[in-house]
């Protein structure tokens, strides 16, 4: 059975995470490179899931930062060859535990993300609920999804 670890990215893992995002969002999904790396990256906490049997290769990533009383989740990506194994869900669940416990997110009442519309079922399986209308982001339909953060005192 494969061994995976979910954790905050080290500086080296952050570089791998950026390369993974470019592969998934730019090379595969054809989003513009100049939109992928943005002004939120330096503000965000970046999480990765690594595969121990592959020299701790980064196989998935996401980022989170605060906007008012929301934890904004974004850039959720898993390498195609690792999709369908529950790794994205593990990444999101780990982030949820982090949001419940980290003082930096204490003011956040809920987590918010902009899901590609055709990926919304994944987030529904993670407990997120769609709110609002479908909107266009870079030519791709998206919808905002939310989940309450139950802080651990």
Where do the protein language model's features map onto the residues?
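Conserved beta-strand segments that form the floor/walls of ligand-binding pockets within enzyme
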Residues: 63, 72, 77, 86, ...
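A conserved beta-turn-beta hairpin within the catalytic core of GNAT-like acetyltransferases
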Residues: 66-74, 83, 105-107, 138-141
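Conserved catalytic-core motifs of GNAT/GCN5-like acyltransferases
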Residues: 112, 124, 129-144
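Conserved GNAT acetyl-CoA-binding A-motif
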Residues: 92, 99-116
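Conserved acetyl-CoA pyrophosphate-binding loop and the N-cap/start of the following alpha-helix
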Residues: 82, 86-95
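A short beta-turn/loop motif at secondary-structure boundaries
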Residues: 37-42, 114, 136-137
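Conserved beta-strand in the GNAT
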Residues: 48, 56-65, 70-77
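Short amphipathic alpha-helix that is part of the acyltransferase structural core
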Residues: 1-35, 41-46, 50-57
